[in-house]
């Protein structure tokens, strides 16, 4: 369910930062800073270091993203 203008990639959470921000290493080796999407925050989905996540990136700034899914 990615938006048309967003790039969706998978990665692994490497580090937890303050204010529900995370450092995520993508499949291609790039490291981005990502925050939790509103629906995940609303449903109290916990994200820990080492979790596999799906990240939405915008073409305008590829260093920041939004975590939209956590794999089980």
From Swiss-Prot:
This is Translation initiation factor IF-1. HAMAP family: IF_1 (MF_00075). SMART domains: S1. Belongs to the IF-1 family. GO terms for molecular function: ribosome binding; rRNA binding; translation initiation factor activity. GO terms for cellular component: cytosol. It comes from the Bacteria. The keyword Cell division does not apply. Residues 1-72 form the S1-like domain. Its main location: cytoplasm. InterPro entries: NA-bd_OB-fold, RNA-binding_domain_S1_IF1, S1_domain, TIF_IF1. Keywords: Cytoplasm, Initiation factor, Protein biosynthesis, RNA-binding, rRNA-binding. It comes from Chromohalobacter salexigens (strain ATCC BAA-138 / DSM 3043 / CIP 106854 / NCIMB 13768 / 1H11). One of the essential components for the initiation of protein synthesis. Stabilizes the binding of IF-2 and IF-3 on the 30S subunit to which N-formylmethionyl-tRNA(fMet) subsequently binds. Helps modulate mRNA selection, yielding the 30S pre-initiation complex (PIC). Upon addition of the 50S ribosomal subunit IF-1, IF-2 and IF-3 are released leaving the mature 70S translation initiation complex. It is found in: Cytoplasm. Transmembrane segments: none annotated. Component of the 30S ribosomal translation pre-initiation complex which assembles on the 30S ribosome in the order IF-2 and IF-3, IF-1 and N-formylmethionyl-tRNA(fMet); mRNA recruitment can occur at any time during PIC assembly.
């Amino acid at each position: 369910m990615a938006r048309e203008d967003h790039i969706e990639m998978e990665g692994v959470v490497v580090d937890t930062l303050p204010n529900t921000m995370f450092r995520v290493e993508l499949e291609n080796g790039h490291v981005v800073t990502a925050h939790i999407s509103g629906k995940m925050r609303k449903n109290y989905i916990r994200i820990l270091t080492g979790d596999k996540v799906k990240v939405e990136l915008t073409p305008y700034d590829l260093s920041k993203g939004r975590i939209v899914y956590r794999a089980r």
